From Swiss-Prot:
Disulfide bonds join C109-C189. Residues 63-72, 132-154, 229-251, 317-353 are cytoplasmic. The keyword Protease does not apply. Keywords: Cell membrane, Disulfide bond, G-protein coupled receptor, Glycoprotein, Lipoprotein, Membrane, Palmitate, Receptor, Transducer, Transmembrane, Transmembrane helix. This is a receptor for bradykinin. Could be a factor in chronic pain and inflammation. Residues 1-41, 94-110, 176-207, 273-295 are extracellular. The gene is BDKRB1. The chain crosses the membrane at residues 42-62, 73-93, 111-131, 155-175, 208-228, 252-272, 296-316. It comes from Sus scrofa (Pig). A lipid is attached at C330 (S-palmitoyl cysteine). Its main location: membrane. This is B1 bradykinin receptor. InterPro entries: Brdyknn_1_rcpt (IPR001186), Brdyknn_rcpt (IPR000496), CCR1-9-like (IPR050119), GPCR_Rhodpsn (IPR000276), GPCR_Rhodpsn_7TM (IPR017452). GO terms for biological process: cyclooxygenase pathway; G protein-coupled receptor signaling pathway; inflammatory response; response to mechanical stimulus; smooth muscle relaxation of the bladder outlet.
Amino acid sequence: MASQTLVVFQASNQSQLPPPNATLCDGAQEAWHLLHKVLPTCVVAICSGGLLGNLFVLSVFLVPRRRLNAAEIYLAHLAASDLVFALGLPFWAETIRNGFHWPFGAPLCRVVNGVIKANLFISIFLVVAISRDRYRALVHPVASWRRRRRRHWAQATCVLIWTAGGLLSIPTFLLRSVQVVPELNVSACVLPFPHEAWAFVRTVELNVLGFLLPLAAILFFNYHILAALRGREQLSRTRCGGPRDGKTTALILTLVAVFLLCWTPYHVCAFLEFLLHVRAIRGCFWEDFTDLGLQYTNFFAFINSCLNPVIYVFWGQLFRTKIWELYHRCLPRKLTAVSSSRRKEIFQIFWRN
Protein backbone atom coordinates (compact mmCIF):
# COMPACT_ATOMS: atom_id res chain seq x y z
CA MET A 1 0.00 0.00 0.00
CA ALA A 2 1.23 3.94 -0.20
CA SER A 3 3.50 5.95 2.02
CA GLN A 4 3.38 9.67 2.68
CA THR A 5 6.99 10.37 1.83
CA LEU A 6 10.29 9.04 0.66
CA VAL A 7 12.34 11.81 2.25
CA VAL A 8 10.93 14.79 4.12
CA PHE A 9 12.97 17.93 4.65
CA GLN A 10 10.87 20.81 5.87
CA ALA A 11 11.69 24.48 5.72
CA SER A 12 12.18 24.50 9.47
CA ASN A 13 15.03 21.98 9.07
CA GLN A 14 13.01 19.30 10.88
CA SER A 15 13.48 16.25 8.70
CA GLN A 16 13.81 12.54 8.34
CA LEU A 17 17.37 13.11 7.19
CA PRO A 18 19.92 12.16 9.84
CA PRO A 19 21.50 15.28 11.36
CA PRO A 20 25.24 14.61 10.94
CA ASN A 21 26.55 17.42 13.12
CA ALA A 22 23.94 17.23 15.86
CA THR A 23 24.45 15.49 19.16
CA LEU A 24 22.88 12.08 18.77
CA CYS A 25 21.53 9.81 21.45
CA ASP A 26 23.43 6.64 22.25
CA GLY A 27 23.12 4.11 19.46
CA ALA A 28 21.55 6.48 16.91
CA GLN A 29 24.55 6.42 14.58
CA GLU A 30 24.54 2.63 14.59
CA ALA A 31 20.80 2.63 13.88
CA TRP A 32 21.25 4.93 10.87
CA HIS A 33 24.13 2.80 9.61
CA LEU A 34 21.96 -0.31 9.86
CA LEU A 35 19.16 1.48 8.02
CA HIS A 36 21.40 2.47 5.07
CA LYS A 37 22.89 -1.01 4.88
CA VAL A 38 19.93 -3.34 5.38
CA LEU A 39 16.74 -1.47 4.53
CA PRO A 40 17.30 -1.02 0.75
CA THR A 41 17.65 -4.76 0.20
CA CYS A 42 14.50 -5.42 2.22
CA VAL A 43 12.57 -2.78 0.27
CA VAL A 44 13.62 -4.30 -3.07
CA ALA A 45 12.44 -7.71 -1.85
CA ILE A 46 9.08 -6.22 -0.83
CA CYS A 47 8.85 -4.46 -4.20
CA SER A 48 9.39 -7.74 -6.06
CA GLY A 49 6.82 -9.55 -3.93
CA GLY A 50 4.32 -6.70 -4.27
CA LEU A 51 4.65 -6.50 -8.05
CA LEU A 52 4.38 -10.24 -8.68
CA GLY A 53 1.70 -10.85 -6.06
CA ASN A 54 -0.59 -8.02 -7.08
CA LEU A 55 -0.18 -8.76 -10.80
CA PHE A 56 -1.27 -12.31 -10.00
CA VAL A 57 -4.27 -11.07 -7.99
CA LEU A 58 -5.35 -8.71 -10.78
CA SER A 59 -5.02 -11.46 -13.38
CA VAL A 60 -7.25 -13.76 -11.31
CA PHE A 61 -9.89 -11.03 -10.96
CA LEU A 62 -9.77 -9.62 -14.49
CA VAL A 63 -8.84 -12.44 -16.89
CA PRO A 64 -12.11 -14.44 -16.58
CA ARG A 65 -14.68 -12.83 -18.87
CA ARG A 66 -17.44 -12.24 -16.37
CA ARG A 67 -18.62 -9.30 -14.31
CA LEU A 68 -17.12 -8.84 -10.89
CA ASN A 69 -19.38 -8.43 -7.90
CA ALA A 70 -19.08 -5.39 -5.62
CA ALA A 71 -16.60 -6.96 -3.18
CA GLU A 72 -14.39 -8.17 -6.03
CA ILE A 73 -14.39 -4.70 -7.61
CA TYR A 74 -13.08 -3.16 -4.39
CA LEU A 75 -10.47 -5.90 -3.92
CA ALA A 76 -9.26 -5.53 -7.51
CA HIS A 77 -8.84 -1.78 -7.03
CA LEU A 78 -6.95 -2.39 -3.78
CA ALA A 79 -4.58 -4.73 -5.64
CA ALA A 80 -4.13 -2.08 -8.35
CA SER A 81 -3.33 0.52 -5.70
CA ASP A 82 -0.76 -1.79 -4.10
CA LEU A 83 0.75 -2.47 -7.53
CA VAL A 84 1.14 1.24 -8.36
CA PHE A 85 2.63 1.85 -4.93
CA ALA A 86 5.16 -0.98 -5.36
CA LEU A 87 6.44 0.66 -8.55
CA GLY A 88 7.76 3.57 -6.46
CA LEU A 89 9.68 1.44 -3.96
CA PRO A 90 12.92 1.02 -5.99
CA PHE A 91 13.37 4.82 -5.98
CA TRP A 92 13.02 4.91 -2.19
CA ALA A 93 15.46 2.00 -1.79
CA GLU A 94 18.09 3.67 -3.96
CA THR A 95 17.66 6.97 -2.10
CA ILE A 96 18.26 5.28 1.26
CA ARG A 97 21.26 3.41 -0.16
CA ASN A 98 22.76 6.72 -1.37
CA GLY A 99 22.43 8.42 2.02
CA PHE A 100 19.26 10.31 0.93
CA HIS A 101 20.82 11.59 -2.31
CA TRP A 102 18.18 11.77 -5.06
CA PRO A 103 19.81 11.03 -8.45
CA PHE A 104 16.64 10.82 -10.57
CA GLY A 105 15.91 14.51 -11.20
CA ALA A 106 13.17 16.93 -10.15
CA PRO A 107 10.32 15.59 -12.36
CA LEU A 108 10.60 12.06 -10.94
CA CYS A 109 10.94 13.55 -7.46
CA ARG A 110 7.49 15.09 -7.82
CA VAL A 111 5.87 12.21 -9.72
CA VAL A 112 7.12 9.34 -7.55
CA ASN A 113 6.30 11.07 -4.27
CA GLY A 114 2.97 12.35 -5.58
CA VAL A 115 1.88 8.89 -6.68
CA ILE A 116 2.95 7.37 -3.37
CA LYS A 117 1.12 10.10 -1.44
CA ALA A 118 -2.03 9.56 -3.50
CA ASN A 119 -1.94 5.82 -2.87
CA LEU A 120 -1.68 6.34 0.89
CA PHE A 121 -5.16 7.87 0.80
CA ILE A 122 -6.51 5.56 -1.91
CA SER A 123 -5.59 2.42 0.01
CA ILE A 124 -7.23 3.39 3.30
CA PHE A 125 -10.31 4.85 1.56
CA LEU A 126 -10.70 1.53 -0.28
CA VAL A 127 -10.49 -0.35 3.02
CA VAL A 128 -13.31 1.88 4.32
CA ALA A 129 -15.37 1.19 1.19
CA ILE A 130 -14.77 -2.56 1.48
CA SER A 131 -15.84 -2.52 5.13
CA ARG A 132 -18.95 -0.51 4.30
CA ASP A 133 -19.93 -2.95 1.54
CA ARG A 134 -19.69 -5.91 3.93
CA TYR A 135 -21.60 -3.91 6.56
CA ARG A 136 -24.51 -3.32 4.19
CA ALA A 137 -24.51 -6.93 2.99
CA LEU A 138 -24.48 -8.49 6.47
CA VAL A 139 -26.01 -5.98 8.88
CA HIS A 140 -28.73 -4.64 6.56
CA PRO A 141 -29.28 -7.47 4.06
CA VAL A 142 -32.95 -6.60 3.43
CA ALA A 143 -32.18 -2.97 2.72
CA SER A 144 -29.08 -3.85 0.71
CA TRP A 145 -29.33 -2.91 -2.93
CA ARG A 146 -29.75 -5.40 -5.70
CA ARG A 147 -26.53 -6.96 -7.01
CA ARG A 148 -26.51 -4.81 -10.13
CA ARG A 149 -26.93 -1.55 -8.21
CA ARG A 150 -24.22 -2.57 -5.72
CA ARG A 151 -21.84 -3.13 -8.64
CA HIS A 152 -22.55 0.31 -10.10
CA TRP A 153 -22.16 1.91 -6.66
CA ALA A 154 -18.82 0.11 -6.17
CA GLN A 155 -17.54 1.31 -9.55
CA ALA A 156 -18.57 4.90 -8.85
CA THR A 157 -17.07 4.77 -5.35
CA CYS A 158 -13.72 3.57 -6.70
CA VAL A 159 -13.63 6.41 -9.24
CA LEU A 160 -14.31 8.92 -6.46
CA ILE A 161 -11.62 7.37 -4.26
CA TRP A 162 -8.94 7.56 -6.95
CA THR A 163 -9.98 11.16 -7.69
CA ALA A 164 -9.81 12.11 -4.00
CA GLY A 165 -6.37 10.54 -3.67
CA GLY A 166 -5.15 12.55 -6.66
CA LEU A 167 -6.56 15.81 -5.30
CA LEU A 168 -5.04 15.29 -1.84
CA SER A 169 -1.62 14.67 -3.41
CA ILE A 170 -1.61 17.90 -5.46
CA PRO A 171 0.55 19.81 -2.91
CA THR A 172 3.15 17.05 -3.15
CA PHE A 173 3.14 17.20 -6.96
CA LEU A 174 3.53 20.99 -6.85
CA LEU A 175 5.94 21.55 -3.94
CA ARG A 176 8.36 18.61 -4.08
CA SER A 177 11.77 19.65 -5.37
CA VAL A 178 15.40 18.59 -5.41
CA GLN A 179 17.49 20.82 -3.13
CA VAL A 180 21.07 20.72 -1.94
CA VAL A 181 21.47 19.80 1.74
CA PRO A 182 24.98 21.05 2.64
CA GLU A 183 25.03 19.28 6.01
CA LEU A 184 24.77 15.91 4.26
CA ASN A 185 26.49 16.88 1.01
CA VAL A 186 23.57 15.51 -1.01
CA SER A 187 20.82 16.74 -3.32
CA ALA A 188 17.66 15.46 -1.66
CA CYS A 189 14.06 15.17 -2.83
CA VAL A 190 12.46 17.44 -0.24
CA LEU A 191 9.12 18.98 0.67
CA PRO A 192 9.78 22.59 1.78
CA PHE A 193 6.81 24.19 3.50
CA PRO A 194 6.09 27.73 2.19
CA HIS A 195 4.62 28.72 5.57
CA GLU A 196 4.72 27.40 9.13
CA ALA A 197 0.95 26.82 9.03
CA TRP A 198 1.52 24.09 6.45
CA ALA A 199 2.82 21.79 9.19
CA PHE A 200 -0.60 21.87 10.84
CA VAL A 201 -2.40 21.45 7.51
CA ARG A 202 -0.20 18.47 6.68
CA THR A 203 -0.97 16.85 10.03
CA VAL A 204 -4.72 17.30 9.57
CA GLU A 205 -4.47 15.89 6.06
CA LEU A 206 -2.24 12.94 6.91
CA ASN A 207 -3.32 11.91 10.40
CA VAL A 208 -6.96 13.02 10.44
CA LEU A 209 -8.19 12.62 6.84
CA GLY A 210 -5.72 9.85 6.05
CA PHE A 211 -6.05 7.78 9.22
CA LEU A 212 -8.20 8.79 12.20
CA LEU A 213 -11.50 9.40 10.37
CA PRO A 214 -11.12 6.31 8.15
CA LEU A 215 -10.08 4.31 11.23
CA ALA A 216 -13.25 5.34 13.06
CA ALA A 217 -15.36 4.25 10.08
CA ILE A 218 -13.46 0.95 9.74
CA LEU A 219 -13.90 0.13 13.43
CA PHE A 220 -17.60 1.02 13.33
CA PHE A 221 -18.36 -1.11 10.28
CA ASN A 222 -16.30 -4.11 11.38
CA TYR A 223 -17.66 -4.07 14.94
CA HIS A 224 -21.18 -4.41 13.56
CA ILE A 225 -20.03 -7.00 11.00
CA LEU A 226 -18.60 -9.20 13.76
CA ALA A 227 -21.75 -8.75 15.85
CA ALA A 228 -23.91 -9.74 12.87
CA LEU A 229 -21.76 -12.80 12.19
CA ARG A 230 -22.05 -13.97 15.78
CA GLY A 231 -25.81 -13.43 15.84
CA ARG A 232 -26.46 -15.16 12.52
CA GLU A 233 -23.95 -17.99 12.59
CA GLN A 234 -26.57 -20.71 12.54
CA LEU A 235 -28.61 -18.96 9.85
CA SER A 236 -25.55 -18.52 7.63
CA ARG A 237 -24.98 -22.28 7.56
CA THR A 238 -28.40 -23.00 6.12
CA ARG A 239 -29.12 -19.88 4.07
CA CYS A 240 -28.46 -20.12 0.34
CA GLY A 241 -25.27 -18.21 -0.43
CA GLY A 242 -24.33 -17.94 3.23
CA PRO A 243 -21.02 -19.80 2.97
CA ARG A 244 -19.87 -17.64 0.06
CA ASP A 245 -20.70 -14.45 1.94
CA GLY A 246 -18.94 -15.74 5.04
CA LYS A 247 -15.79 -16.58 3.09
CA THR A 248 -15.69 -13.11 1.55
CA THR A 249 -16.23 -11.48 4.96
CA ALA A 250 -13.47 -13.55 6.61
CA LEU A 251 -11.04 -12.50 3.87
CA ILE A 252 -11.95 -8.82 4.23
CA LEU A 253 -11.71 -8.84 8.03
CA THR A 254 -8.21 -10.30 7.72
CA LEU A 255 -7.21 -7.64 5.18
CA VAL A 256 -8.50 -4.86 7.46
CA ALA A 257 -6.68 -6.22 10.53
CA VAL A 258 -3.35 -6.55 8.69
CA PHE A 259 -3.75 -3.10 7.12
CA LEU A 260 -4.22 -1.44 10.52
CA LEU A 261 -1.35 -3.42 12.04
CA CYS A 262 1.02 -2.29 9.29
CA TRP A 263 0.00 1.37 9.08
CA THR A 264 -0.75 2.42 12.67
CA PRO A 265 2.94 2.70 13.76
CA TYR A 266 3.70 4.99 10.81
CA HIS A 267 0.88 7.41 11.64
CA VAL A 268 1.95 7.49 15.30
CA CYS A 269 5.47 8.53 14.24
CA ALA A 270 4.09 11.07 11.76
CA PHE A 271 2.10 12.69 14.58
CA LEU A 272 5.20 12.72 16.80
CA GLU A 273 7.01 14.54 13.99
CA PHE A 274 4.34 17.25 14.09
CA LEU A 275 4.69 17.55 17.88
CA LEU A 276 8.44 18.03 17.42
CA HIS A 277 7.84 20.65 14.75
CA VAL A 278 5.63 22.75 17.06
CA ARG A 279 8.00 22.04 20.00
CA ALA A 280 5.34 20.26 22.04
CA ILE A 281 7.98 17.59 22.70
CA ARG A 282 11.74 18.21 22.68
CA GLY A 283 15.00 16.49 23.24
CA CYS A 284 17.53 14.23 21.64
CA PHE A 285 15.61 11.07 22.37
CA TRP A 286 12.40 12.22 20.67
CA GLU A 287 14.25 13.59 17.64
CA ASP A 288 16.14 10.35 17.02
CA PHE A 289 13.14 8.20 17.88
CA THR A 290 10.92 10.09 15.41
CA ASP A 291 13.46 10.37 12.58
CA LEU A 292 14.38 6.70 12.74
CA GLY A 293 10.84 5.66 13.52
CA LEU A 294 9.49 7.29 10.36
CA GLN A 295 11.96 5.33 8.24
CA TYR A 296 11.40 1.96 9.90
CA THR A 297 7.62 2.32 10.18
CA ASN A 298 7.55 3.38 6.52
CA PHE A 299 9.17 0.04 5.77
CA PHE A 300 6.69 -1.77 8.02
CA ALA A 301 3.83 -0.09 6.15
CA PHE A 302 5.37 -1.13 2.82
CA ILE A 303 5.03 -4.78 3.84
CA ASN A 304 1.26 -4.42 3.55
CA SER A 305 1.49 -4.12 -0.24
CA CYS A 306 2.95 -7.62 -0.59
CA LEU A 307 1.03 -9.20 2.31
CA ASN A 308 -2.37 -8.66 0.70
CA PRO A 309 -1.80 -11.20 -2.12
CA VAL A 310 -0.63 -13.74 0.46
CA ILE A 311 -3.82 -13.14 2.45
CA TYR A 312 -5.92 -13.63 -0.67
CA VAL A 313 -4.35 -17.04 -1.33
CA PHE A 314 -4.07 -18.51 2.16
CA TRP A 315 -7.11 -16.97 3.90
CA GLY A 316 -9.48 -16.36 1.00
CA GLN A 317 -11.28 -19.55 0.10
CA LEU A 318 -13.42 -17.62 -2.37
CA PHE A 319 -10.27 -16.31 -4.05
CA ARG A 320 -8.91 -19.85 -4.31
CA THR A 321 -12.17 -20.84 -5.98
CA LYS A 322 -11.60 -18.08 -8.54
CA ILE A 323 -8.09 -19.45 -9.15
CA TRP A 324 -9.68 -22.83 -9.84
CA GLU A 325 -12.11 -21.21 -12.30
CA LEU A 326 -9.22 -19.52 -14.11
CA TYR A 327 -7.25 -22.77 -14.13
CA HIS A 328 -10.27 -24.61 -15.57
CA ARG A 329 -10.64 -22.03 -18.37
CA CYS A 330 -6.96 -22.16 -19.31
CA LEU A 331 -6.63 -25.96 -19.09
CA PRO A 332 -5.95 -27.49 -22.54
CA ARG A 333 -8.77 -29.70 -23.77
CA LYS A 334 -6.29 -32.55 -24.32
CA LEU A 335 -6.00 -32.94 -20.56
CA THR A 336 -9.67 -33.77 -20.06
CA ALA A 337 -8.90 -37.46 -19.53
CA VAL A 338 -9.10 -36.70 -15.80
CA SER A 339 -12.64 -35.77 -14.91
CA SER A 340 -13.43 -32.16 -14.05
CA SER A 341 -14.69 -33.12 -10.60
CA ARG A 342 -11.50 -35.10 -9.88
CA ARG A 343 -9.24 -32.21 -10.96
CA LYS A 344 -11.20 -29.84 -8.73
CA GLU A 345 -10.89 -32.26 -5.81
CA ILE A 346 -7.11 -32.47 -6.30
CA PHE A 347 -6.84 -28.70 -6.59
CA GLN A 348 -8.85 -28.10 -3.40
CA ILE A 349 -6.70 -30.61 -1.49
CA PHE A 350 -3.60 -28.72 -2.64
CA TRP A 351 -4.95 -25.40 -1.33
CA ARG A 352 -6.48 -26.78 1.85
CA ASN A 353 -5.52 -24.82 5.00
